[in-house]
Every structure is written in C-alpha cells, then in structure tokens.
Design a protein with these regions (language model features):
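Short amphipathic alpha-helical face segments that pack within enzyme cores
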Residues: 129-137
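Active-site proximal loop and beta-alpha junction motif in alpha/beta enzyme cores
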Residues: 1-124, 136-177
C-alpha cells in the first residue's frame, strides 16, 4: 500500500497510516471475540499479581496494516519480551501471528513507553505500526490523550488519533543503501 507523507521541519515526516480495524475477522483472529478484551491463559497465570503488571491481564487487538495486541502495564521495561513475545505471537487465536507490545502510559497521558516484539523479527527497537496501534488502543481505552508521544528504546514518534485516520510524525533517516 502507498502512504501519504508530508515534510515537517528538516528531518521529520508526517505519514497518514490509515484507519485502524477493530473487527475480529479483520485483525484477524481465529474466532469471534471482543477485540478490546482478549485474554490468553498463560499471560494471565504468568503475570497476575506481579508488581509491574497493573490492571487486568487482557490485551487489546487491532490491525494497522498488520495485526497487533497491546498490553498496558505499569513498567513495560520489566517485561521479559524475549520469553513472552514469541509465545503470544504464535498463539492459536492469531492465524497470521501477531505483533506484541507491552506499554506504560505516563500520568500526564501524553507519553507512552513501549517494549515491542515484532512478528517474524523478534524484539525491535522501533516500529511505526506498533506506535500507532498502541496510541490508538490507549486512546480508545481512555488511558491516553488523542495525541501522544510513543517512546521506544531508540527514539520517539508523535501519534495523532484525532480523526479516523492515524497520523505518525517522526524523524526519517537512511538505514541502508
């Protein structure tokens, strides 16, 4: 697919990432379920009552051009993503596998830290669709503002969910020629 982009300042680009899909068959999931409340048994038993896990043990699923599940926790840096990421990525309810994000939303509701497991790639330092999916899920659940900054290990992106389409703004650099 082709995405529209505009230049913002010297190094930033603003990209229209399109609309999020929330229907179970568009993510896709293997069976009909509430995509805002997806529970996986081993996640629940592994993390229930752990100090870095706040709230419920459910994930929020959506598709931003690829499937994502987002877990909101008090400290995403404490999650062993290398252990849990591949188990969730390949879980039976995800016929096309899934990107896995653990996210921590700041008290000001404007900043979100993430720890991402990208399907087929493993732990990643940054992922644009994960940033968009996380910001949209946080906003839909009333955890974050409509505009937020998503922080990865190696950088940040500004995400705007104020319209049906999601807009991502951040620096662009050449990685490989």
């Amino acid at each position: 697919r082709v995405l529209d982009a505009e230049i913002v300042g010297e190094k930033n680009k603003k990209i229209n990432m399109g609309k999020a899909k929330f229907n179970w068959n568009e993510i896709p999931l293997s069976k009909e379920m509430n995509t805002e409340w997806v529970e996986i048994d081993f996640v629940k038993t592994t993390f229930l009552n752990k100090p870095h896990w706040s709230g419920d043990t459910h994930g929020f699923c959506l598709n931003i051009g690829n499937p994502h599940i987002i877990y909101f926790v008090s400290d995403c840096s404490k999650i062993n993503i290398k252990e849990l990421g591949p188990k969730i990525e390949n879980y039976k309810i995800f016929p096309e596998r899934v990107n896995v994000t653990f996210a921590s939303v700041s008290a000001d509701r404007e900043n979100i830290k993430v720890n991402v497991w990208e399907r087929g790639a493993g732990q990643t330092k940054a992922c644009g669709t994960a940033a968009c999916a996380t910001a949209k899920a946080a906003w839909c659940q009333g955890l974050a503002n409509v505009n937020s900054n998503v922080h990865f290990k190696d950088g940040s992106l500004q995400i705007d969910c104020s319209t049906d389409n999601i807009f991502m703004t951040g620096p662009v650099s050449e990685v490989k020629k």
